[in-house]
């Protein structure tokens, strides 16, 4: 499969189809990340690289009408020191695009803010979109376990709930997601991660 993607990339390069070449490179890296099943947790820096590959593909799909900005409030060393379950950010950004920005029918933006909780030392990642938002009831439902019927129908909150549960499985009940939204004004999903997680635990 990788050889096939590489062939597509070179054909696109020869024909000066830059967009196709870049999307193919990003897809190849994403597939390699999926195949890495031996590491449950990865440095935040690696997770952002994966997210960048995913977003590159989406930018071409939406003609550059969606932007993704990363804002660092604290030291960028958080990227190396903080550990996060692989494929945590991508499903949340995907949800923001498909269920937040796309339904409003115009350009949109997603902002990632990384900071530390001064009281606990935890790392907080705030993912904010300017999409259609949701009601308080919908925001509460997102973090509740979906029914079998909802899971089969791929309801909006299934992917978000899965991310929430993986975070709690990895770090404990004190960690995971929280959702703050206003109907018609966008949504903010906050990821809480331990700031001093022992990387050696990931090897067991």
Where are each of the predicted segments found?
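Two-component histidine phosphotransfer core
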Residues: 2-178, 188
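C-terminal end segment of the histidine kinase catalytic
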Residues: 177-204
């Amino acid at each position: 499969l990788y050889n096939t993607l590489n062939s597509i990339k070179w054909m696109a390069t020869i024909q000066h189809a830059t967009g196709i070449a870049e999307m193919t490179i990003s897809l190849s890296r994403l597939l390699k990340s999926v195949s890495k099943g031996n590491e449950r947790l990865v440095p935040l820096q690696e997770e952002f690289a994966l997210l960048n590959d995913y977003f590159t593909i989406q930018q071409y799909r939406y003609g550059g009408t969606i932007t993704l900005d990363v804002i660092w409030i604290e030291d960028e060393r958080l990227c190396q020191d903080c550990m996060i379950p692989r494929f945590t950010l991508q499903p949340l950004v995907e949800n923001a695009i498909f269920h937040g920005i796309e339904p409003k029918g115009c350009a949109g933006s997603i902002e990632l803010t990384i900071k530390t909780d001064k009281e606990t030392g935890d790392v907080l990642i705030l993912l904010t979109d300017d999409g259609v938002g949701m009601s308080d009831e919908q925001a509460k439902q997102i973090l509740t376990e979906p029914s079998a019927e909802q899971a089969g129908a791929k309801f909006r909150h299934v992917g978000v709930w899965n991310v929430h549960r993986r975070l709690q499985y990895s770090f404990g009940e004190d960690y995971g997601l929280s959702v703050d939204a206003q109907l018609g004004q966008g949504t903010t999903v906050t990821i809480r991660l331990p700031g001093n997680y022992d990387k050696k635990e990931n090897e067991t």
